[in-house]
UniProtKB/Swiss-Prot annotation:
Belongs to the glutaredoxin family. GO terms for molecular function: oxidoreductase activity. This is Glutaredoxin-like protein ECU08_1380. It holds the Pfam family Glutaredoxin. Keywords: Cytoplasm, Electron transport, Redox-active center, Transport. Residues 26-126 form the Glutaredoxin domain. Has a glutathione-disulfide oxidoreductase activity in the presence of NADPH and glutathione reductase. Reduces low molecular weight disulfides and proteins.
Length: 129
């Protein structure tokens, strides 16, 4: 099982991850959540984070992914909003329930899985000043 999780983490590891031009603060992440249509904070080797990334990828949903591993400010921001990973925001609002909630939304074709044009396009990263 660990080998499978490692392989999935390597495949989905850094796709769509926001690296930005410099060090971002918790306030910067808050601003990013307000600006972005769809954003998810993940742990690279967390099985729920891997499953959520896989689901978004398979359904063609463009969502900004922030890896919190080795990023204390991103981790602190995510943990302040939700106790487990992944931490998912849609239109600036926290979607509670993590991976399980994403599966329910996907099965019901609800946002972000309703093929809204803003969510299925590849969006350029928002660079904060």
């Amino acid at each position: 099982m660990k080998a499978v999780l490692l392989a999935l983490a390597l495949v989905y590891g850094s796709q769509g991850t926001e690296y930005g031009g410099g060090k971002m603060t918790e306030a910067d992440y808050g601003e990013m959540v307000r600006r972005e249509k769809c954003i998810m904070f993940v742990k690279r080797f967390c099985p729920y984070s891997i499953r959520a990334r896989e689901l978004l990828h398979d359904r063609g949903v463009g969502c900004k992914i922030i890896e919190v591993d080795n990023n204390l400010d991103a981790y602190s921001f995510a943990k302040r909003n939700h106790s487990t990973f992944p931490v998912f925001f849609l239109d600036g609002d926290l979607v509670e329930g993590g991976c399980e909630k994403l599966l329910v939304l996907s099965d019901s074709n609800l946002p972000p899985f309703d093929k809204s044009p803003l969510l299925t396009q590849n969006r350029e990263p928002v660079l904060l000043d």
